[in-house]
């Protein structure tokens, strides 16, 4: 990967969300950044100001000398910038007209509209960050919980980079030793070379395995946990959704069948980002609209990572309750016995024959009784108490998981090849493949098409 790139043109983009707001930021990056901003800026001589300073002034239209906006201009000179290029950031008043007018002026004097993710891509190509750090930028932007934010910040600081580079160094050292032993066989025996390869393959495989064990938790932090709230009509599903959200998103009445569709909301439960789905009550109905809602509810159960199955403790179990218990047996689930504020009519002995005791939480959504226990159970079920852990090195996306699996497969080939008595130079190929796959994670050996695809997923101006 190059450590510096100088052939880029100068790019610009609005880095803040569109629409009305207190402040908008327009960003420039490239060799001509200072020259371009000087054409449209009236204030201090920016050639003479110190780097990493903010300067008051006005953006003007040079053709008419009309003031476009009152601004603060940040000047950041290469190489100590995010892109390792000269960077200018214009803080102007929020809004669509002024912000876009400034953008158009910059483009009219030589800047090009940046592609999505191009600022971060330049940071990567100029050696400022690697691919794991680039991905963590997007993870940080999209983080829905403090835990997800902390994992992203640690990866941006290089926690995963450091770990992967150490693994690659372990492999590189053994490959170098094998090369020496192959070139100078008089100083080595086949047994010694294969022993070195085997020990290193098993060591690196173990460390990759430890990383892969974090994949599910990392995926949950990054994408959210698809959680379906299910149950027959009027057992308290929508009340539970509203309680977790702390706002009234679902209609709550004592009329069965009020929720006729699937409602989705994100909520942070003790560091676990839940993508909550409040489903229509599952029951037999002749209403065409309700039937559609029921079918969508069944589909939501199939797709869900976690099921919150709500039962009404103030009524005996029904056929529909039993069907839902059976339908969710193979899913991660929590059985919520709601309405504990009312006299119990549910046969708990029968329930114990249908579900495990550790799946059951008793609640009254109306009085908030048991909701804290429910939240604790969700955190325990998926993070096993690690939500307070200081260790934040996690695999957070499918690309990283896939490459680690491929690297591990190459190590399996090394181990099986040695066991089968294969020549060292053939076994060495699989070890090199592992080294390459780990390099793709950080971008040291990633193909150009992958890099282009990855950065195209970023937002404009980042």
UniProtKB/Swiss-Prot annotation:
Positions bound to K(+): 234, 253, 255, 258
UniProt keyword list: Cytoplasm, GTP-binding, Hydrolase, Magnesium, Metal-binding, Nucleotide-binding, Potassium, tRNA processing
List of residues binding (6S)-5-formyl-5,6,7,8-tetrahydrofolate: 27, 89, 128, 462
Pfam families, per database record: MMR_HSR1, MnmE_helical, TrmE_N
Gene Ontology biological process terms from the UniProt entry: tRNA methylation; tRNA wobble uridine modification
Positions contributing to Mg(2+) binding: 238, 259
GO molecular function list: GTP binding; GTPase activity; metal ion binding
Top-level taxon in the UniProt lineage: Bacteria
Main function: Exhibits a very high intrinsic GTPase hydrolysis rate. Involved in the addition of a carboxymethylaminomethyl (cmnm) group at the wobble position (U34) of certain tRNAs, forming tRNA-cmnm(5)s(2)U34.
Record note on quaternary structure: Homodimer. Heterotetramer of two MnmE and two MnmG subunits.
Name of the molecule in the record: tRNA modification GTPase MnmE
The organism of origin for this protein: Latilactobacillus sakei subsp. sakei (strain 23K) (Lactobacillus sakei subsp. sakei)
């Amino acid at each position: 990967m190059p450590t510096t790139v100088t052939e880029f043109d100068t790019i610009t983009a609005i880095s803040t969300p569109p629409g009305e707001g207190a402040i908008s930021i327009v960003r420039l990056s490239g060799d001509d950044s200072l020259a371009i901003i000087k054409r449209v800026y009236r204030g201090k001589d920016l050639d003479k100001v110190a780097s990493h300073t903010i300067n008051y002034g006005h953006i003007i239209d040079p053709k008419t000398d009309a003031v476009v906006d009152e601004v603060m201009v940040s000047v950041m000179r290469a190489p100590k910038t995010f892109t390792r290029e000269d960077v200018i950031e214009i803080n102007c008043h929020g809004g669509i007209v002024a912000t876009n007018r400034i953008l158009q002026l910059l483009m009219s004097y030589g800047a090009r509209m940046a592609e999505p993710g191009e600022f971060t891509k330049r940071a990567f190509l100029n050696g400022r960050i690697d691919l794991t750090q680039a991905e963590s930028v997007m993870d940080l932007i999209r983080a829905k919980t403090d835990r997800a934010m902390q994992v992203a910040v640690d990866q941006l600081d290089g926690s995963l980079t450091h770990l992967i580079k150490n693994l690659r160094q372990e492999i590189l050292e053994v490959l170098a030793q094998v090369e020496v032993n192959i070139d100078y066989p008089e100083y080595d025996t086949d047994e010694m070379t294969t022993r070195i390869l085997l020990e290193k393959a098993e060591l690196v495989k173990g460390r990759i395995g430890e990383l892969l064990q974090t994949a599910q938790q990392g995926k949950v932090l990054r994408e959210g946990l698809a959680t379906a709230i299910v149950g027959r009509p009027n057992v308290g599903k929508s009340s539970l959704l509203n309680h977790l959200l702390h706002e009234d998103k679902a209609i709550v009445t004592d009329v069965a069948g009020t929720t006729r569709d699937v409602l989705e909301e994100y909520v942070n439960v003790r560091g676990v980002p839940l993508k909550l789905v409040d489903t229509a009550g599952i029951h037999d109905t002749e209403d065409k609209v309700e039937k559609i809602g029921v079918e969508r509810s069944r589909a939501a159960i199939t797709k869900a990572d976690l099921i919150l199955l709500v039962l009404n403790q103030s009524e005996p179990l029904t056929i529909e309750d039993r069907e839902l218990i059976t339908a969710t047996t193979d899913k991660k689930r929590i059985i919520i016995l709601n309405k504990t504020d009312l006299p119990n009519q549910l046969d708990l002995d029968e329930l114990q024959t249908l579900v495990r005791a550790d799946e059951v939480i008793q609640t009254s959504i109306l009085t908030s009784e048991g909701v804290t226990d429910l939240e604790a159970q969700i955190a325990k079920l998926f993070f096993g108490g690690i939500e307070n852990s200081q260790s934040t090195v996690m695999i957070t996306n499918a690309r990283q998981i896939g490459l680690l699996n491929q690297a591990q497969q190459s190590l399996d080939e090394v181990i099986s090849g040695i066991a089968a008595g294969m020549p060292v130079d053939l076994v060495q190929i699989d070890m090199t493949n592992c080294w390459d796959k780990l390099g793709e994670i950080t971008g040291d050996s990633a193909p150009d098409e992958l890099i282009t695809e990855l950065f195209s997923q970023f937002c404009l101006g980042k």
